[in-house]
Amino acid sequence: CACLVGSEMCIRDSISNYDIIIKLIGNGEDLMNNNKNITVKQAIDRYIESKYAVLSPSTVKGYMIVKRNQLQNLMEVKLSDLNSELYQSAINSDMLKYSPKSISNAVGLVNAAVKMFAPEIRSKLYVTKPQKIKTSFYIPEKEDIDIIYNRIKHSNPNLLKPFLLASQCGLRPSEISALSGDCICKGQIEIKAAIVLDHQGHPIRKAPKTYAGYRSIPISPQMEKVLLKNINNRKESICGGMTAKEIGNEWRKFFDTNTDLYYFKFYALRHYYASKCLLMGIPQRYIAELMGHSSTNMIERVYQHVFPSAMQKYKLLLADSMNMILETN
């Protein structure tokens, strides 16, 4: 009977498909078991490899540094042997050498790698990270900026443009490095790229890390003139092709020869810009946009500072307000 033959064929096909499914499930279990046999270090390597195309070069470099230096008591442990006690012990050892932020970053990397290759193990890991320490930032005063500007202008011309771009425009060193003449037009600086070092230390051009990184920053006609000085080709680098590392080195050399000035990191010029915007009364959402942040969280968490002199003025105002109530009663 044709119907019977057809039914037998369907049954045979069903059995065959069932065998294939069982075999695939078995292979999946084998694969999961193999994943459990890799070490934490191997899991991190494979995690980086799987994400390499979408991670920024600086992030990859940071991951490689973590793998090489932090949580070393974990690196040769198989995922199948990993438990909360071992994990916490490795964290405790690192507390003597690294900041809470560094440890938190390392834990985040290990968690992500373990979750990718052994999610059931990750769900059983419970550790306590060291408490965050409130970070204090040095913010130079306007008087400091004026003094530094005048000295750089006369003695370190190579540093002049990076200094102005950071202190007056709020650019990151990597963005300064990528800036070319065609990024400046009609009173605007267009931020479209950054130059960073890859994990091998080679400078590469990349798109901004987030969509918010693409932005326009207003500049005065005089500033535009200064930035475009000695630029013969609009494709030419504004700062002579200096990398962020070279800018930092030049900045340190400047302070080495100006020992009467209080040293602060080049990145503090960006803090100065943010604080200046806050003191001018610019809304936080606009400051975030100018600085390339996707939200105001960073402004509130990091840049919500005022100049020490301005803070002193506010303290005096508060003290005077106390006198008012005492004098009227």
List each model region and its residues.
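C-terminal catalytic core of tyrosine-transesterase DNA break-rejoin enzymes
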Residues: 101, 164, 168, 174-175, ...
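Single conserved hydrophobic/aromatic residue that forms the stacking wall/gate
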Residues: 1-13
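Active-site/catalytic core of tyrosine-dependent DNA strand-transfer enzymes
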Residues: 218-261, 273
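Basic, Lys/Arg- and aromatic-enriched nucleic-acid-binding interface segment
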Residues: 100, 120-173, 177
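Short, aromatic/basic-rich helix-turn unit that serves as a nucleic-acid recognition element
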Residues: 36-67, 94-97
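N-terminal DNA-binding recognition helix of tyrosine site-specific recombinases/integrases
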Residues: 80-127, 172-174
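Catalytic-site neighborhood detector that most strongly recognizes the C-terminal catalytic loop/helix
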Residues: 53, 57, 195, 224, ...
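C-terminal secondary-structure termini that scaffold catalytic or DNA-interacting sites
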Residues: 33, 199, 204-214, 221-223, ...
